[in-house]
A protein has these predicted regions:
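Conserved helix-turn-beta segment immediately C-terminal to the redox Cys motif
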Residues: 16-36
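Stable alpha-helical elements in mature extracytoplasmic
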Residues: 15, 33, 65-69
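Flexible, glycine-rich phosphate/dinucleotide-binding loops
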Residues: 10, 35, 91
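Local sequence-structure signature of Cys/Sec-based thiol-disulfide redox active-site neighborhoods
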Residues: 1-22
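Charged, low-complexity surface patches
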Residues: 5-8, 27, 42
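Thiol/selenol-based redox catalytic cores and closely related redox-interacting motifs
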Residues: 40-117
């Protein structure tokens, strides 16, 4: 897994540590801007946070938990990536908020949990 974050990002390291504790191998990169990574991964601008990751060809926005990454690895769903829709502080460990799967058209679909109404 590759994680791209900017100098101003204060949360990527804690998310990476949580994933490493779950057995994931993670490389971290600190480019000047995330635009090239996001363009390559086709990340919708509406989901952009302070870091983005690439896992098995999918983009990951937000602090997606290990369970979501394992599900991606097992199911290989049609789509370009997933995004965690809850604040980072709630996303450590289990799934406290919904995770959406983004399709080829950039449309988000409920994937894990239910979006808050």
């Amino acid at each position: 897994m590759n994680v791209y974050f900017t100098h101003s990002c204060r949360c990527a390291h804690s998310w990476v540590q949580a994933l490493q504790a779950e057995g994931f191998v993670v490389k971290m990169f600190e480019p000047e801007t995330l635009k090239p990574a996001r363009a390559a991964l086709h990340t919708p601008a509406s989901l952009n946070g302070c870091h983005v990751a690439e896992f098995m060809g999918y983009f990951i926005e937000g602090h997606a938990p290990a369970v979501a990454l394992r599900r991606l690895a097992t199911e290989h769903p049609a789509g370009t990536g997933i995004a965690m829709l809850s604040p980072a502080s709630k996303a450590e460990g289990g799934v406290d908020g919904p995770v959406v799967l983004v399709d080829q058209e950039g449309i988000s679909h409920a994937w894990i949990g239910e979006p808050q109404r």
